[in-house]
Amino acid sequence: MTPIRKLDDSRSNGARVADVRKRYLEFFEKRGHAVIPSAPIVPENDPTTLFTSSGMQPLVPYLLGEPHPEGTRLADSQMSFRAEDIEEVGDNRHTTFFEMLGNWSLGDYFKQEQLPWFFDYMTSTEEGLGLNPEHLYVTVFAGDEESGMAADSESVEIWKKLFGDKGIEAKFVELGTEERGNELGMQGGRIFSYGAKKNWWSRAGVPAKMPAGEIGGPDSEVFYDFGLPHDPKFGKECHPNCDCGRFIEIGNSVFMQYQKQEDSSFKELPKRNVDFGGGLERLAAAVRGDADIFMIDVFDAARAVLEERSGKQYGDADATRSFRIILDHMRAASFFISSGIRPGNSEQGYVLRRLIRRSIREADKLGIKDAVLAEVAEGFGAAYADAYPFVQAAAETIREELEKEEVQFRKTLVHGMKELEKMGGAIDAFMLFTTYGFPVELTEEIAKERGIALDMSAVQEKMETHKNLSREGAAQKFAGGLADHAEQTVRYHTAHHLLLKALQVVLGPDVHQRGSNITSERLRIDFSYGQKMTDEQKREVERIVNEKIAEAIPVVRTDMKKEEAEKLGAEHEFGATYPETVSVYSVGPLDSAFSIEFCGGPHVANTSELGEGGKHFKILKEEASSAGIRRIKAVLE
């Protein structure tokens, strides 16, 4: 392969993730973009999705037309987590936690600016990454016969010119489907077109599945060719969308330009948007010229711990997959715990527990029998100190939680073994996994040791069904989260603001929100308080909230400088960072407001709407959530 330029770095083996992130944000800032902070890894006030899973997710209201306080050009690096990818981790490119570099045009620029800018960022030696354009391949939308959507010929012409300016002839090849690509291969192409399954974006999927009113559009992806030999088990021929590992997607520009009509036709949006997402870790790997994401610098310290404790080297055939799973899972766990998530049996806590338990099993495979996860996780604090200092600040908590969970899971393994013994020759590996968290691989090994024939195909079928249901649930949650601005949910969101202030009035000013979950059926708030509330305190909180509902107070949104909002004492989300200009919602005018919070909305226009139909605010339950944290569930009825 042609050597590629490395970024300035004290390490000899490639660019640091911090360099790639910094250059990206500076590049787009120079082009008029406001750099906004990453949203929290757990979405605020959104019960329909467990995690922030893309850079676009926190910005959906603005892509749908709501004005953003920072303007029409935005850029960021967003912390993201995809639980559905847990089982995929182990190859050279899949991770659960990752950072998504993003830039957005909210009705501002479009294809003619976006594609040249990203190409320049990738290839420029002055402002960008200095990637060799010979290693870049792109895909575009081939059109969709079912919906009548035309092919994206405009992007094809833009890409031809960009490569041509670098002295590269960019042959266009129409593949249409991944299967066709597996049959025909590259054919000397540089630009490839695929159908709606690969190169169209909408929340509902392909054009035919989009409901009336839904927006969407074609996208154009960029792949980096690492020059690895093609693995024929992924198809006869290789092409950009092949999964053999030779090509890795490093960026995707989505052009939101259409809205579906009642008659199933599409019309151009009056304001077209650009939504770009680029994998930070994958871009860093491309700069290094090494397809293995787990060799980038943020994993160095953790990888060294595993090598020392196991006596094995990363790259050893029998160790690499276990290394990768532990490295990925402990990075995610570090961000989870430092964001306030604790191991548990539901929602985010369950996912964290699953990550930890899988890591313990993989450590066992490496021959590490003593506690090691806390030591592995320790290196991530320093690795992300520049962008996410809260991880390093929570080092002691991360260590304590991982050590505690590791001890607990060792006990779980003991319980699982007892149940396995009771089963005799009729071992139910799926039940052991779902009930006790007992790893299927461990059950399989013990069955082999005892000469028991375990029908692993049936087990894997059940596991695959279980995994698909989880993925479908995650997809439904994500889709629902984008659209759930239902009237009653909005009312509960406003009631949540009233409740938090009422708690501060009754329990003291040190009470602050530590989590929330709002649906159209009820609201839930986690808040800092060290003891159980008395019945009298709960009644007083209810009285205050209902009093503010009866007072028919206007709810006002104001965009202002962050410093001004802080001076006003506006409540803000625990652990979150905010841009220089923020939106605040106040119950009442700012100079005499009952409550003021940093918030993106939506809310009712007046508190009286919460009492429509004679409804009153009522606390259903007050209970402990975790140490020093209480939880209230409440309704309007």
Describe every region a protein language model picked out.
Residues 1-637:
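A glycine- and charged-residue-rich anion-binding loop/surface
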